[in-house]
C-alpha cells in the first residue's frame, strides 16, 4: 500500500521538458545576402545570427524561410574561414605561367651547358667500350647479367 503511494507521488513529480524555440522568422535584412557580409560582420553579430538560426532549425524545416535556409547552408558549408579557397581568381594562371617559365629556363640552361661542354669523354667512344668488353670477358666478370659496356652507336 505504501509502495503504491510512492509510485503515484513519483509520477506526479516528473517534469516534461518543454522547448521554447523562437517561433517567428528572422528579419530578411539579417539573413539576406549573408554571403557578402559574413566576413566583415563583428563576431558578436555572427554569434547572434548563428544562435537565432540554430533555434529556428529546431522547428520543422518547412517553417524556415528561403533566406534562412540559404543562410544556414552558408554558415555551415560556405566558403569562409577554413573553407575559404586557397587560390583566388587569377592565381591559377599566374602559377601556370610561372611553371612554364621555369621549364623553359631549365631547358635553355640544359642546352647552354651541353653546347659549352665540349667533346664527349674518351670512355664514351665505341672502341673504348669494345676493349672494355674484351677485358671483362677475359676476367669472367658478371657472367649472369652480362658485361656489355657498349652504349654508343
Curated annotation (Swiss-Prot):
| Gene3D superfamilies per UniProt | Cytochrome c oxidase subunit IV (1.10.442.10)
> Which Gene Ontology molecular-function terms are recorded?
oxidoreductase activity
InterPro entries of this UniProt entry?
A: Cyt_c_oxidase_su4_fam, Cyt_c_oxidase_su4_sf
Domain of life of the native organism:
Eukaryota
Q: Which residues lie on this side of the membrane: Mitochondrial matrix?
A: 21-88
Gene Ontology CC entries for this record = mitochondrial inner membrane; mitochondrial intermembrane space; mitochondrion; respiratory chain complex IV
Mitochondrial intermembrane-side segments: 112-153
| Protein name as catalogued | Cytochrome c oxidase subunit 5A, mitochondrial
Q: Which gene encodes it?
A: COX5A
